[in-house]
């Protein structure tokens, strides 16, 4: 059966119209916030050598089931990146960017072969922030900066319905002891587990806690909790973290079943969950945590790191549902009825655009009635046009909302006045 040429692949989408506008606005917020918090932008390839992901997330679903792998013409095994942290760590090791603490920010597409549904796609965008090679005794302050950054981004986006969940997974030694106990516990209930979870008992029992179906089962809710395995040092660290969150009046909920979908997370982990019901279910808008073991895969020892990533499509879905989204309409449409007027309006457009006004114009002469129809369809607030018997060096300016018409000196445009009428029309 032939595939239709006019369909995009399953799990992908096209950005246009309101979605494209929101995407651009969201991206702008992230770049502005990254600058405010002094994060440097980093861009890694969309595809990497597959072993970067295979060795850092051996039993994670995104590698075992969802990784887009392929061989190039030279027989090298490559993969489309499913997440952004491992490629950044590869870049840090390759370019020796580890002499001092570094703060990186990225924004780009990721790829996972998963079942598409609301808020989940096979090609999707993530915005991520990573703080690498920080001093061990500064953990709670690194966490505070990450959380404050997230809240600042949400504020800029106008998103205020969310819940912060936190957990502490301890170090590798404690976590291994916990996982053995967890596996023994789930063995008793193996007949009640989903097929994939039966495999996870031996490979990665923590993922059973994170499974949406398993989470609803009573015996999973009653499974051993990580905090009962904490050392005294773990308890002290966790208390310092919660104390500083409370100091800054940051609401949080401790969820001892919270784990992350990537294997390399340890110590502190967190998620901000959407509570608006826009996405239909309580999906994570952003999640992250510490990944002190990941750098060792790249030959970087004693290398403390923390990071997080936002799901951009989920943010866009929430913003689409809000009633107060303003379209970015044109400021001026320059209407021409003759070829000579088109040339004059191109010169005017150049001047107006230089002053940062949003401008468009017709490049084919129109009749008066069709021309004004076009101007209204453009969404412009005002239209410039030349009238018959127009006074020399003047052009007419019409307010398309009120119908008010006035004469403007073409040779000496008063930009202050134009700015004032644009602002007045926006507040009307």
Swiss-Prot record:
EC numbers on record: 6.1.1.21
Gene Ontology cellular component annotations, sorted alphabetically: cytoplasm
Keywords, comma-separated and alphabetical: Aminoacyl-tRNA synthetase, ATP-binding, Cytoplasm, Ligase, Nucleotide-binding, Protein biosynthesis
Pfam families assigned: tRNA-synt_His
GO-annotated biological processes: histidyl-tRNA aminoacylation
Subcellular location, record wording: Cytoplasm
Family annotation (InterPro entries): aa-tRNA-synth_II (IPR006195), aa-tRNA-synth_II/BPL/LPL (IPR045864), Anticodon-bd_dom_sf (IPR036621), His-tRNA-ligase (IPR015807), HisRS-like_core (IPR041715), HisRS/HisZ (IPR004516)
Alphabetical list of CDD domains matching this protein: HisRS-like_core
Main location: cytoplasm
GO molecular function, one term: ATP binding
The reaction(s) this protein catalyses: tRNA(His) + L-histidine + ATP = L-histidyl-tRNA(His) + AMP + diphosphate + H(+)
Similarity comment: family membership: Belongs to the class-II aminoacyl-tRNA synthetase family.
Subunit structure: Homodimer.
Protein name: Histidine--tRNA ligase
Organism encoding this protein: Mesomycoplasma hyopneumoniae (strain J / ATCC 25934 / NCTC 10110)
Gene name of the encoded protein: hisS
